[in-house]
Structure formats: structure tokens, C-alpha cells
């Protein structure tokens, strides 16, 4: 299987599993918590059919990548992404992040610039700043909320995932119509196969402050979000994000949950392909 080495922990290398398919302009898809690059299958199929080269990779700690106990912060995640881009020598690439993966996109552009990048897309994003503070009243929640998530993951991450996916996909509305029990089970299995340390460390990165990164986005951008998102509510994320980046193309998918890559794949793919074609 293909791997890219991004670091070292004690006697073992830290290797990221990746897939590289198709030809044409490269599109790099960066997954969300607690999934893997395979969560993009409905977008990958559409992009390949449209003539793009599609690269997915599993973030450290998730999927088939190494499961280290170090490097769970967005500076390191962005450095990992930079290593992927440099190793594959990608040029004129499009970065597409989903949920937690949008953080890599923002921090990469801020830290490494856009010499290799043509466009960026933020799907169900966590920008600009989830933490509710005195100087950020639009934040989603106080730090105690995120501490509670970490505690729940440490207590029984497998039970946590079951509840997490209920709201991730809005199963009370979409199970049996827009998503099957089998697809939900696959998400749970993917989550369970990830590292225990990564599962607990990831939520501490969600309240990273990206407000200083956003002004450095100097390529065409797409912000797309579901109005029914219970995981990252649109009023705390995309709508505020768009005000900070008014040049971005902005799309709201009516009624879509956080996990809209699967439940509203047609709407997502239509908007993404239209953005790429411009």
C-alpha cells in the first residue's frame, strides 16, 4: 500500500496512507473526524468521471495511517499536508477540506502560501473560531463543552461514536432515505479503527483560532455548508466565515446535516464541480 512518511515517534516512522487516481488537475480531499480518505467515495467518483486526478489521504491517527501519540495540532497537520504535496510534486492543485479537514486547508495556505494551489474549498467547515470567548461571541461553545467531548471519548469512544453519528447524519430525519444503516455502520467501523489517542486529541484542535489565517487565502474559495448541520451549526461557522472571506463563493445546502458528503452527495458534487470548472 502507498504511504508517505511525515515524521518519527521513537523507533517507528509516522506514515500517511494515501490514494492517487486519475489524471488531470489534481484535487486533494482532506477528510473529517473520525473518518478516513474513503469517506470521499461519492465525491471521488464524480471527480474522476469529470476528468480530475483525485488524491485522498488519511490524517495521522486515522484510517490506515500510523497512530502516533504526537502531532495533533494544525501546524503539524498542515506540515503533513505540505509533505504530501511536495512528495507527489503537485502543482495547480485544488485543496478540498471537509469539517476538521478544512483546518488543514486554512492553516496550509496561511503557512505555506499558494504557489502549488489553484483553488480551495471548505465543506461543512469549522472556521473561523469555534470557541466562544469574550472577543468571539459568535463561537459555538465554551471550552468546557469540548472538554466534555474529550472526557466522553476517553470513557468509551465506541459508545461516543454511536451518538456522534446520530447528529452527524441527522439520522432521525435521514436514516432509510438519504443514508442506510449499512453506511452508518461503515462510518462507525472506520471511526473505531482509528487510534485511541487521536480520537481524544482531535477535539482539542477543533477550537483552533483560524481568524488570522483567513485573510491569507488569496485564491478562489468555496464555502459550502448544510443548514441542518447539528455538529458545526452554520450560524457559528459558514455564515461568519463568509463575512470574513466575502470573496468566496458561498453555498448553503438546505436541510443538509454535517455528513452531507454522503446524504447530499448530488448537491455537494454539483456545487463542487461547478466551482472547479470556473
UniProtKB/Swiss-Prot annotation:
Keyword Kinase: no
Active-site annotation: 99, 229, 258
Domain of life assignment: Bacteria
Alphabetical UniProt keywords: Chloride, Oxidoreductase, Peroxidase
Coiled coil is among the record's keywords: no
Molecular function terms from GO: chloride peroxidase activity
Positions of the AB hydrolase-1 domain: 26-264
EC number: 1.11.1.-
UniProt-listed PANTHER family: HYDROLASE, ALPHA/BETA FOLD FAMILY PROTEIN, NON-HEME CHLOROPEROXIDASE-RELATED
Family: Belongs to the AB hydrolase superfamily. Bacterial non-heme haloperoxidase / perhydrolase family.
Subunit structure: Homodimer.
This protein's name: Non-heme chloroperoxidase
Lineage of source species: Bacteria, Bacillati, Actinomycetota, Actinomycetes, Kitasatosporales
Gene for this chain: cpo
